[in-house]
């Protein structure tokens, strides 16, 4: 049984890869994407290394079992936006998509409990949260 948590260099943000499963069938979970520079400096190189480790051809996608976004602060979100933007561009240009998210989970607990404090903080934000 394989279970490792890898913290990628995200400077002041968070970008974690959870590896689980077995040596013959490893699986990956991405937790947050870090700030903008994290994608090119840490996340993309690590995902490319995983593609090589799994011996994927250029036409095969690296499967990311679950992508988790804990909250929409830029130091958790921006790297993830770049990941999805790259996949979108590849699809538009009819190129192979290098990484495929099987499922996406966004922490909406505060929305569920109708946390008024969170709503007040969000209304004070200077810019809207980017959409994925």
Where are these regions (language model features)?
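Conserved beta-strand hairpin/beta-sheet module of binuclear metal-dependent hydrolase folds
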Residues: 1-63
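Solvent-exposed loop/turn segments at secondary-structure junctions
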Residues: 35-38, 72-76, 110-112
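Active-site metal-binding motif and surrounding structural segment of the metallo-beta-lactamase
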Residues: 26, 41-104
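Flexible, acidic/histidine-containing loops and adjacent segments that form or flank the divalent-metal
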Residues: 1-3, 59, 81-132
């Amino acid at each position: 049984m394989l279970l490792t948590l890898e913290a990628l260099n995200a400077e002041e943000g968070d970008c974690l890869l959870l590896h689980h499963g077995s040596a013959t069938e490893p699986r990956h979970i991405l937790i947050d994407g870090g700030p903008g520079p994290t994608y090119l400096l840490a996340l993309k190189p690590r995902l490319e290394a995983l593609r090589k480790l799994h011996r994927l051809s250029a036409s095969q996608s690296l499967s990311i079992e679950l992508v988790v976004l804990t909250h929409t602060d830029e130091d958790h979100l921006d790297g993830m936006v770049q990941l999805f933007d790259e996949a979108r561009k590849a699809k538009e240009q009819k190129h192979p998509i290098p990484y495929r998210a099987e499922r996406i989970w966004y922490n909406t607990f505060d929305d569920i409990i109708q946390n008024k404090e969170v709503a007040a903080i969000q209304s004070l934000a200077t810019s809207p949260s980017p959409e994925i």
